[in-house]
Swiss-Prot record:
Full protein name: Uncharacterized protein B354L
Homology family: Belongs to the asfivirus B354L family.
Superkingdom of the organism of origin: Viruses
Organism: African swine fever virus (isolate Pig/Kenya/KEN-50/1950)
Record-linked InterPro entries: P-loop_NTPase
Amino acid sequence: MALTTPSGKLIPELQFKAHHFIDKTTVLYGPSKTGKTVYVKHIMKILQPHIEQILVVAPSEPSNRSYEGFVHPTLIHYRLWLADKQKKNDNKGAERFLEAIWQRQTMMSSIYSRVNNIDMLKTLYHKLPIDIQQKENKNIAKVECLKAEQTDQKKEEKITSLYQQLLKKIIIQNIHMYKNLSLTEDEKFTLNYINLNPRLLLILDDCAAELHPLFTKEIFKKFFYQNRHCFISMIICCQDDTDLPANLRKNAFVSIFTNASICMSNFSRQSNRYSKQDKEYVEEISHIVFKGYRKLVYIREDEYRQHFYHSTVPLPTAFSFGSKALLKLCKAVYSKEVVIDKSNPYWSKFRLNF
C-alpha cells in the first residue's frame, strides 16, 4: 500500500523479489536493534530457492547468535579469515579470505558457463531417442521462434536463458538415456555438472572495522563491481553510512535504511552526489516512512524509475539455508565445541584453500 506525503507525493510499498538481490550487492544501514538482521533473514528466505551456498561473517555472532537456526555454524565466521590461516597482526588475512572466495566462484562460474553452452546442450538433446525428441520438439520450436523474432537485447537474453533451461530440463529428465551412448569428454563433463548451481550468498554483518583496510584493495572492489559475473550475492550490514566509502555506497544495487537519521545523513552527504530533487524528496518522506517497523529502500537501477520505496517485513521463522548436500557436509565436519575437526576426511573437501 502506497503512502502519501502532505504535498501529495507517493511512496510505493516494495514487495521484495529474488531478482532484487540475486548476483547483486545489498547494503543495510542502521544502528543495532533497528531491524537489520530481520531484513537479512527475510532476504535469505526469498533467495533460498535460488542459492544453495552461503557464508556469513559476523563478529558479534558468539554473543547475539543472530544466525543460529538459520545458517549452519560451520558456515559462520567470526573474523574475515579462516582459523587455519589466522596469524597475529595478519593484515592480509582478510584479503586472502576474500581472494579464496573469489577464486572459487570464478571457477564455479567457468564450469557453469561451459555446461550451459547452447550448442553443447542442443547436441546432447539431439542424442536422445527420436520419440522423446518428437514429444519435446513443439516446445523447443516455440522458444526458437521467439528467439529468432526478438530484437530487444534484454528480452533476447531472457529467451536464451529460457531456451537453456528447457534443454537442460529435458536432458536431466532423460539423463539415464546417455549411460550407454558414446560421448565426448565435453559431453560427459556437461552431463556430470548439469545440475550445478554456482551461486553464493555472502553476508558481512557489522564488519566495518575489518573491512576498512580493504576498501582500496582490488579484491574488495571486485565484490562490488563484478560480483554478478561470479554469481555472488552480497549483503553488507553497516551501523552508519560512513562505514563504506562513497564510491562503494553508490554502487550498491539495493540500499535499505532502518533509521531516519542515518537515511537523512546519507542522502544529504555531499560526497554521495544525490540530486537536489532526491534530497528534498527524502527529507519529506522520512517523516512518514520511519514509523512502526517501516524502513526506506532505495533501488539504484529501478526498472520502474521510482527508486524510493517503503517496506515492512515479517519476523522470520527458523529455516536452514543451503542445499541438502551442503547441510549434510556441514553436519559431517561439525564439532559442538565450535572447533572444526580437521582430521575428519570431509574437511579437505569443505574448506576454502588459499
